[in-house]
């Protein structure tokens, strides 16, 4: 768990004049539980999945961000990135690329090997996004337009309503 990532995010958002607030809450195991703890809607949650896309003898890492009430279609990620197969990264790969444990990964990439993509639905449904910020008991609630402006994710349609 990464206090450093939490502080790095707060510093980035502050220097970029983002409209955000940090929230402390009890650790939660699911997106639904953390939404209740934050006092936000489930769909406001920005779920960040570290994926491995293989193909053509290469391996790429992708941070795929989608609404917490949607599920990721790994085949669509594979197609969009020109791979032959995509899977979720191992816990060790997640830690190496994000400095975070699974479940606490924020929707920002601070690693050169980790390409950031987001499903367009993430940016259109709510005025604010909520996400774990490097720690399972801390979240940031951020203006959606500020997220798009600062993170600048590549938009890829890969999420489906559950």
Residue ranges and their predicted role:
Residues 1-162:
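Extended, low-hydrophobicity, polar/charged segments
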């Amino acid at each position: 768990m990464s206090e450093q990532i939490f502080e790095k995010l707060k510093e980035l958002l502050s220097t970029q004049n983002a409209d955000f607030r940090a929230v402390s809450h009890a650790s939660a195991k699911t997106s639904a539980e953390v939404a209740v703890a934050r006092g936000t809607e489930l769909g406001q949650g920005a779920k960040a999945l570290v994926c491995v896309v293989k193909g053509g003898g290469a391996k790429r890492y992708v941070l795929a961000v989608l609404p917490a009430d949607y599920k990721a279609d790994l085949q669509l990620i594979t197609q969009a990135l020109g791979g032959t197969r995509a899977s979720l990264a191992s816990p060790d790969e997640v830690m190496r690329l994000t400095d975070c444990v699974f479940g606490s990964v924020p929707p920002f990439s601070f690693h050169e090997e980790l390409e950031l993509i987001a499903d367009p639905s993430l940016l259109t449904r709510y005025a604010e996004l909520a996400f774990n910020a490097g720690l399972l008991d801390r979240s940031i609630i951020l203006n959606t337009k500020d997220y798009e402006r600062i993170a600048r994710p590549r938009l890829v349609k890969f999420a489906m309503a559950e």
